[in-house]
Design a protein with these regions (language model features):
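...captures the hydrophobic TM-helix bundle architecture rather than a specific catalytic motif
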Residues: 1-265
Length: 268
């Protein structure tokens, strides 16, 4: 069930993007919206199991990097914090998909639009469910790419071009700090798994931990559009209205909140 709620938005987005001409506009609407709505229903069931019944779930998909120096795995953990955000994201995304069917009805590029929406949702779920910093980083960067594509959906409009570029560049400032913090974590801990890092943190140098914490906070400020890195958020409304609702709601901006919360309280 948890693998389905994770993978359905990706499958829907890929079907709409790669097979859009064959399945048509209506087919794209049905596939992407159904996939996200089913994932949302599964997330509600998962929320009951994980949060209310206190039964966290971990899924190991395979190793990404395996060496004597560092091991990075493709692992997903559905705990109280991640399921709370995933459920919110999928419910809001399913509503945005439904609204977009009518709103984008006159646009000739529906398949591309719904593909972007679904892939954005998928990478947001990947970010929140990742069991280590590198899986989180993959989701983090790809939601930036998807948000750029969505804001710049009407790419023939100069205002949309400028807004998308501004969003992309401002987020890169925060992402640079995030990248440095992840490299520092690898150098200090020799591991990127949340559980290992959190358990070893009390034994590490406080100055190094403070520096890493500040870098992580600065990285989160970019996604959450906090003071100094908030200039991209108002201009993001240059994209279609459903894009603005998805980015301005508890989806993209919640990524920075999640990054902060996982370090305030160890996932359980």
């Amino acid at each position: 069930m948890f693998f389905l709620l994770f993978s359905l938005p990706c499958l829907g987005g890929m079907a709409s993007g790669l097979l859009g001409r064959k399945i048509g506009v209506t087919g794209s609407h049905i596939i992407t919206t159904s996939a996200v709505m089913i994932a949302a229903i599964l997330s509600i069931i998962g929320f009951y199991e994980v949060v209310l019944c206190h039964s966290p779930v971990t899924i190991h998909l395979g190793d990404w990097v395996h060496s004597e120096v560092l091991t990075v795995s493709w692992s997903l953990t559905f705990d109280t914090l991640s399921m709370s955000i995933i459920t919110t994201v999928l419910i809001i995304s399913s509503l945005v998909h439904l609204y977009s069917i009518d709103y984008m009805s006159s646009d000739p590029h529906n398949q591309r639009f719904f593909s972007y929406l679904s892939l954005f949702t998928f990478f947001m779920v990947l970010l929140v469910s990742g069991d280590n910093y590198f899986v989180l980083f993959v989701g983090w960067e790809f939601i930036a790419v998807c948000s750029y594509l969505l804001i710049n959906f009407w790419f023939t409009v100069i205002e949309a071009n400028k807004s998308a570029m501004q969003s992309f560049i401002v987020n890169r400032v925060g992402d640079m700090a995030l990248s440095v913090s992840f490299l520092a974590i690898v150098a200090l801990f020799g591991n990127v798994d949340f559980s290992t890092v959190f358990s070893l943190a009390p034994m590490m140098n406080e100055s190094a931990l403070t520096m890493i914490g500040l870098l992580l906070l600065f990285g989160g400020m970019g996604k959450s559009a906090q003071i100094g890195l908030n200039t991209w958020l108002p201009t993001a409304m240059a994209g279609p209205t459903p894009v603005s609702s998805l980015i301005h709601s508890a989806t993209l901006v919640s990524a920075g909140v999640y990054l902060s919360l996982i370090h305030i309280s160890e996932p359980t």
